[in-house]
Design a protein with these regions (language model features):
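Hydrophobic alpha-helical membrane-embedded or membrane-associated segments
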Residues: 21-28
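Short linear motifs in intrinsically disordered/low-complexity regions
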Residues: 14, 41-43, 284, 291
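C-terminal motif of bacterial Sec signal peptides marking the signal peptidase cleavage site
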Residues: 30-34
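Bacterial N-terminal signal peptides that target proteins for export
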Residues: 5, 9-21
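Bacterial signal peptide processing site
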Residues: 36-38
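Low-complexity, acidic Ser/Thr/Pro-rich repeat tracts that form intrinsically disordered stalk/linker regions
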Residues: 42-56
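A surface/extracellular/periplasmic glyco- and lipid-processing/surface-interacting theme
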Residues: 52-106, 111-365
Length: 365
């Protein structure tokens, strides 16, 4: 970064200064000793000066939730793998279970303008008693999951999704083959595909039964940086953000100065969970991605997750950003206009991946 000295160079300069000072002291000692009266039959032994190698402060792991930045997170969970659960957003699936409990909510189109959410939990123990309705996977869901070293929970999938799961060896729990991990809610008068759900206890049991690795890979780096205090963004004011996935799913996020949260409405109606709680977030990240058709009879699509532009909204303000994912198993990262990694305000985050063709319909006011 411009204006900063690399750590290795800084250490080298410090060591050079210490050695130079030590050599000067030795020379001065010799000069003053030569000028004084030499003691009779006395020998002196000069001990060479020693220098202490530069030290660095030990790294201290803060016990914060790696997905929200919130404190008092159990330290024993810091190295555990996150879990991502596919939840549908068809009108017959609403209100959903557990969406306001997720640390991060991802959302993107499945097909026909209908969106699907990936509820992301920092650890399986954070999954509530009921989550759903769980629904099928898409191949670009798997691509996101892979980047976060997450365990994936879904109920079925497209042919492309199953190919991706097999090709990448993704640890996943599928309602089509792991029926004991899921149940059907009997209180709703809708077709069965809109009633499947799971629980935190069932997911943890399935992870144990499948002998999945529960800790993160050694090279894993936490996905987000967080500000130490609430921060305003530099591009302008955002009291309301419209996120237009399609005519079927258009959200309005309205800022509340009372609690610094953005509250969600879907197609003009409050977007509540099954407990009547309105969906709300501290951070909104909207990513614009190129969308293409797979050309099958189901109308399935693909989203290019390699890179793109977007907007970050928080604390009544916004700023334009860029994002990139790179290779299939790379983590999606977010950057400000200067190319520095984005730093979020502490709290829950919504990440919407919207077709680039809809960017002009996503407005800020």
């Amino acid at each position: 970064m411009k204006g900063k000295i690399p750590l290795a160079k800084l250490r080298k300069n410090r060591l050079f200064k210490v050695l130079s000072l030590a050599l000067t002291l030795v020379i001065l000692t010799g000069i003053f000793a030569g000028c004084g009266k030499e003691p009779e039959e006395e020998t002196t032994t000069t001990t060479p000066p020693t220098t202490q190698a530069p030290t660095t402060e030990p790294y201290v792991t803060r016990s914060i939730n790696p997905l929200t930045g919130e404190g008092n997170y159990p330290e024993e969970l810091l190295k555990n793998r996150p879990v991502m659960i596919s939840v549908e957003n068809h009108k017959d699936a609403r209100p959903q279970w557990g969406i306001t409990d997720a640390d991060i909510v991802w959302e993107m189109e499945a097909e026909g303008g209908i969106t699907r959410m990936l509820l992301m939990f920092a650890d399986a123990s954070r999954i509530p008693e009921q989550v759903g309705p769980t629904r099928s996977a898409r191949h670009y869901f798997v691509e996101l999951v892979e980047g976060f070293d997450a365990i994936f929970v879904h109920f079925g999938g497209s042919p492309q999704a199953y190919n991706a799961l097999d090709n990448h060896g993704t640890d996943h729990i599928d309602g089509m083959s792991d029926s004991g991990t899921f149940a059907r809610d009997t209180s709703r008068n809708v077709s069965s595909e809109h009633r499947a759900y799971t629980t935190g206890e069932k997911v943890m049991k399935a992870i144990e039964n499948k002998d999945f690795r529960t800790t993160l890979e050694d090279e894993y780096v936490n996905p987000f940086k967080f500000n130490t205090s609430p921060t305003k963004l530099e591009d302008g004011t955002c009291n309301q953000m419209v996120v237009a996935f399609s005519s079927y799913a258009t959200y309005t996020y309205t800022y509340s100065e009372e609690d610094n949260l953005y509250y969600s409405s879907l197609n003009g109606n409050r977007f509540n969970d099954s407990d009547g709680n309105q969906q709300n977030f501290t951070n909104l990240i909207i990513c614009y991605a190129d969308k293409s058709s797979l050309g099958d009879k189901k109308g399935r699509i693909s989203l290019d997750l390699s890179e793109g532009n977007g907007v970050y909204v928080s604390n009544g303000t916004y700023q334009e950003i860029t994002w990139e994912k790179g290779d299939y198993s790379d983590m999606m990262k977010f950057y400000d206009a200067d190319g520095k990694e984005l730093s979020l305000n502490t709290g829950r985050t919504y990440i919407g991946i919207v077709a680039s063709s809809r960017e002009s319909e996503c407005t800020i006011s």
